[in-house]
């Protein structure tokens, strides 16, 4: 579970870099407008490059800061691992959906596939007990 969590955090860092490099923040209003034709109440989100970059830096910093706690197996490490696994599952699925809606590549879609698959393994790892019967932490 710990190694998978480290891999997921590193993949999120790469995912953030891909989103920034290829302008995710510029393309979200376009996708929001397309989705809004199907779901009229769907919000159209937009933000500046600076805000988007700062949010991604903060996210990666928080995840990196959580690594020692998860690696040591602290009391709430399983909860942290599961929460990130769920978030990355939906993040990956959302990016792949946006690529389909866009009709091709959408910023973040390449690494989203890895996030999605890795999140499934991370979530599965939180459900498996250790061979000696002690839950993994």
Where does each model-flagged region fall?
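A loop-to-helix transmembrane entry motif
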Residues: 40-60, 108
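Perimembrane loop-to-helix junctions flanking transmembrane segments
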Residues: 29-44
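Membrane-water interface at the C-terminal end of transmembrane alpha helices
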Residues: 116-137
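Juxtamembrane helix-break-helix junctions at the cytosolic face
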Residues: 61-78
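Transmembrane alpha-helix/helix-exit interface in multi-pass inner-membrane proteins
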Residues: 10-31
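Membrane-helix boundary connector in multi-pass membrane proteins
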Residues: 74-85, 90-109, 128
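Residues within membrane-spanning alpha-helices of integral membrane proteins
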Residues: 5-12, 60, 81-88, 92, ...
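Membrane-interfacial loop-to-transmembrane alpha-helix junctions, especially the N-terminal start
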Residues: 1-5, 76-84, 135
């Amino acid at each position: 579970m710990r190694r998978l969590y480290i891999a997921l955090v590193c993949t999120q860092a790469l995912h953030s870099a891909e989103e920034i490099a290829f302008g995710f923040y510029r393309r979200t209003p376009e996708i929001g407008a397309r989705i809004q034709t199907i779901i009229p109440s769907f919000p159209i989100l937009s933000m500046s490059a600076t805000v988007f970059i700062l949010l991604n830096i903060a996210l990666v910093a928080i995840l990196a800061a959580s690594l020692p706690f998860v690696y040591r197996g602290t009391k709430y490490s399983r909860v942290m691992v599961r929460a990130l696994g769920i978030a990355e599952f939906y993040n990956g699925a959302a990016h792949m959906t946006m690529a389909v809606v866009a009709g091709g590549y959408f910023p973040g879609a390449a690494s989203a596939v890895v996030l999605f698959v890795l999140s499934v393994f991370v979530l599965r790892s939180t459900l498996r007990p250790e061979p000696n019967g002690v839950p993994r932490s």
